[in-house]
């Protein structure tokens, strides 16, 4: 018989063997800080609903604006691809919310188990790889001015964007291989989870690859790029580019740290039980990232928000270098007008 913790009722992606013979976790709450299972379920469902309701229309608007912009501004194409990755995740949320509402029962069969969970992992990998490419592009634009108008920039950006999706798909395969539809008896239900079949090496390998390629490696690269840009070229820095990078890591860092703890924690330990209890909320925070970018577009485009949402998105995508150049031209033009109006 399996002794389950609370979290498995709400998490559609957990490591099945970790839930075997876990220690009993106290259910009394002397400080009044514990959630009941019903409150926990409601919090998760509200979170999923909010992400869906904000993310789908928001990302659709951003996708439309960035698609129009990308036809004559290469930089906007990065946000078009990022938005598509976020939309991919957002549209899957109603399907992922159903097992939460049914307290862990998976109604979509083995194919749905494999497909829906793989979509979220693909979205994560594609997003972080695209953000890595965006950071490199911004770095080259700042320190190699000739890069902006170079023909090989267009080719390079397109190659990196396509490679981000292909590599993301490739990195999704290992976890998909171990995904199973599992039968439980107490209570009777089907659960979508990862079953490594007791293979510690497989679990460690997949966790390590996900941590290095989906988190640590991109984090080091992007922190280096944006740190140098912020210190040495603050006036030409693109705040939206930095904001989407920071937002990604705020949302996904707890998830990756949690996966490492789950892989490293001793089996049947109290630490593992506690971590698994918190897992659904950490997963929800990671998925919430898919609704974050539209909010950032509205924030950075707030000066034009009174005109229209489209105008706000256009303003958020503006290039600080172009804006600086425009200000310079206006200043020069104004100076000429003042000189011409001076009495001789």
Curated annotation (Swiss-Prot):
Residue intervals on the Cytoplasmic side: 68-78, 144-155, 232-243, 301-344
Transmembrane segments: 45-67, 79-101, 121-143, 156-178, 209-231, 244-266, 281-300
Residues with glycosylation annotation: 3
Disulfide bonds: 113-192
GO molecular function: complement receptor activity; G protein-coupled receptor activity
Protein name per its UniProtKB record: C5a anaphylatoxin chemotactic receptor 2
Compartment(s): Cell membrane
Ranges of the Extracellular topological domain: 1-44, 102-120, 179-208, 267-280
Modified residue annotations for Phosphoserine: 325
Entry similarity comment: Belongs to the G-protein coupled receptor 1 family.
Native organism taxonomy: Eukaryota, Metazoa, Chordata, Craniata, Vertebrata
UniProt keyword annotation of Phosphoprotein present: yes
Subunit details: Interacts with C3 (the anaphylatoxin peptide C3a and the adipogenic hormone ASP); the interaction occurs with higher affinity for ASP, enhancing the phosphorylation and activation of GPR77, recruitment of ARRB2 to the cell surface and endocytosis of GRP77.
Pfam families for the chain: 7tm_1
Gene3D superfamilies hit by this protein: Rhodopsin 7-helix transmembrane proteins
GO cellular component, as recorded: apical part of cell; basal plasma membrane
A GO BP entry: negative regulation of interleukin-6 production
Record keywords: Cell membrane, Disulfide bond, G-protein coupled receptor, Glycoprotein, Membrane, Phosphoprotein, Receptor, Transducer, Transmembrane, Transmembrane helix
Expression by tissue: Highly expressed in liver and spleen. Lower levels in intestine, brain and kidney. Also expressed in adipose tissues with highest levels in gonadal and ingual fat depots. Lower levels in brown tissue.
Membrane-related topology note: Multi-pass membrane protein
Job of this protein: Receptor for the chemotactic and inflammatory C3a, C4a and C5a anaphylatoxin peptides and also for their dearginated forms ASP/C3adesArg, C4adesArg and C5adesArg respectively. Couples weakly to G(i)-mediated signaling pathways.
């Amino acid at each position: 018989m399996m002794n389950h913790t609370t979290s498995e009722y709400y998490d559609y992606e957990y490591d099945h063997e970790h839930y075997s013979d876990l220690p009993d976790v106290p259910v009394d709450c002397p400080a009044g800080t514990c959630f009941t299972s019903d409150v926990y379920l409601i919090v998760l469902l509200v979170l999923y609903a909010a992400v869906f309701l904000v993310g789908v229309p928001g990302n659709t608007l951003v996708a439309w604006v960035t698609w129009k912009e990308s036809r004559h501004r290469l930089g906007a194409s990065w946000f078009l691809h990022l938005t598509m990755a976020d939309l991919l995740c957002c549209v899957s949320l109603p399907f992922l919310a159903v097992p939460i509402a049914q307290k862990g029962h998976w109604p979509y069969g083995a194919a749905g188990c494999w497909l829906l969970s793989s979509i979220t992992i693909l979205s994560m990998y594609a997003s972080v790889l695209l953000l890595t490419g965006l950071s490199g592009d911004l770095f080259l634009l700042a320190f190699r001015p000739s890069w902006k108008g170079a023909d090989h920039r267009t080719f390079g950006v397109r190659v990196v964007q396509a490679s981000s999706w292909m590599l993301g798909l490739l990195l999704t395969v290992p976890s998909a291989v171990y995904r199973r539809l599992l039968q439980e008896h107490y209570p009777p239900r089907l659960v979508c989870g990862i079953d490594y079949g007791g293979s510690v090496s497989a679990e460690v390998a997949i966790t390590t690859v996900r941590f290095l390629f989906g988190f640590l490696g991109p984090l080091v690269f992007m922190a280096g790029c944006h740190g140098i840009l912020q210190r040495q070229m603050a006036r030409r820095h693109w705040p939206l580019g930095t904001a989407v990078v920071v937002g990604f890591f705020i949302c996904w860092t707890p998830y990756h740290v949690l996966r490492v703890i789950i892989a490293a924690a001793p089996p049947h330990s109290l630490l593992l039980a506690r971590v698994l209890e918190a897992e659904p909320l950490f997963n929800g925070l990671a998925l919430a990232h898919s609704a974050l970018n539209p909010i950032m577009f509205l924030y950075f485009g707030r000066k034009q928000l009174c005109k229209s949402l489209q105008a706000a998105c256009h303003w958020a995508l503006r290039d600080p270098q172009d804006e600086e150049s425009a200000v310079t031209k206006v200043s020069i033009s104004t100076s000429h007008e003042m000189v011409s109006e001076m009495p001789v």
